[in-house]
Design a protein with these regions (language model features):
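An N-terminally biased module of ancient metal coordination in phosphate/nucleic-acid-related enzymes
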Residues: 1-98, 157-169, 193, 229-235, ...
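Structural preference for beta-strand elements that scaffold enzyme active sites
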Residues: 5-9, 38-40, 73-77, 100-103, ...
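Conserved, mostly hydrophobic/aromatic
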Residues: 11, 31, 102, 150, ...
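Anion (oxyanion) recognition and catalysis
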Residues: 32, 183, 214-215, 245
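Short acidic/histidine-rich active-site segments
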Residues: 44, 151, 218-234, 254-257
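Extended substrate/RNA-proximal surfaces in nucleic-acid metabolism proteins
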Residues: 52-184
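Extended hydrophobic/aromatic segments used for targeting, binding, or gating
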Residues: 199-223, 235-242
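Short, basic/aromatic-enriched C-terminal tail that caps enzymatic domains
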Residues: 244, 249-266
């Protein structure tokens, strides 16, 4: 990894997320060690079971850590999960703090557990993935966020972990509409590198979808490792940057006070 060419990591979790035990200070220390100038703390706010205390603490810690150092900008982020499943709670979460960056995600579809807990066969997987993209399209049309996280999230578990192949062809019209809606609304698409921590893992989404986003008018790409521990911070970033470059992007984007700021590639 050529550490000097990693501009940012805008998908990080701390012990303010239910699935991480890493203090925010350790994530910042690791980013500084790697020479990364921008990071965003994006702790989980899965809207059906979020903690306002954790989100407020994450936000405050980002501000405190940002004030400590001149060599890194620590952004106040949030990973807003399943926002359409309780709109009142979503409004409350978005109004709780001032954020630099709202990263939107969908870990579970209505009436189902997180894909992490599901082990569908091929027929069940086809139905679940269809419902996932239907709800994701609704979410993208809602539009109250900055970047869309891990577009192909179900494949992290259905295909990568459980080895169930999924024919994506039937979903391509919905995926095209999702990406064109992001592009038309000036939203970013995340290249999530977490899959590359696994043997034979892949980017979420893969490079062909990044290229499709660009062809449909997409302007902004964010990069995120989805690291829950310091050793995973920035893993796979070179591959993510390569995918963005190959698609025709000239830089990646960070959001400061909810406004896009492009960082040109080195």
């Amino acid at each position: 990894m050529n550490l000097l060419k990693i501009p940012c990591d805008c998908h990080l979790h701390t012990d303010n997320s239910f699935d991480s035990e890493t203090p925010a200070a350790l994530q910042v220390a690791r980013a500084r060690e790697l020479g990364i100038p921008y990071i965003a703390l994006t702790d989980h706010c899965d809207i059906l079971e979020w903690s306002d205390a954790n989100i407020a603490r994450s936000n405050a810690q980002a501000m405190e850590l940002n004030a400590l150092y001149d060599d890194i900008t620590v952004l106040r982020g949030i990973e807003l999960g399943e926002p359409l499943q309780d709109m009142d709670e979503t409004s409350r979460a978005l109004g709780l703090c001032e954020y630099d960056f709202v990263l939107c995600s969908l870990h579970n579809i209505r009436g189902e557990e997180d894909f992490y807990y599901l082990h569908p066969d091929r027929a069940q997987a086809a139905d679940l993935v269809r419902r996932y993209f239907e709800e994701l399209l609704e979410t993208v049309k809602w539009n109250q966020f900055d970047s869309l996280a891990h577009l192909t999230y179900p494949l992290r578990y259905i295909t990568e972990r459980d080895g169930v192949s999924v024919d994506m062809t039937p979903y391509l019209p919905m995926i095209q509409e999702i990406l064109s809606t992001l592009a038309a609304n000036g939203k970013a698409l995340e290249i999530n590198t977490s899959g590359l921590r696994n043997p034979d893992g892949m980017l979420l989404p893969t490079a062909d979808y990044v290229e499709l986003f660009r062809r449909l008018g997409g302007r902004y790409i964010t990069l995120g490792s989805d690291a829950h521990t310091p050793e995973h911070l920035a893993v796979g970033m070179e591959e993510g940057i390569a995918a963005a470059k190959e698609a025709g992007f000239t830089g990646v984007t960070v959001f400061i006070n909810r406004q896009p700021v492009e960082i040109p590639f080195a």
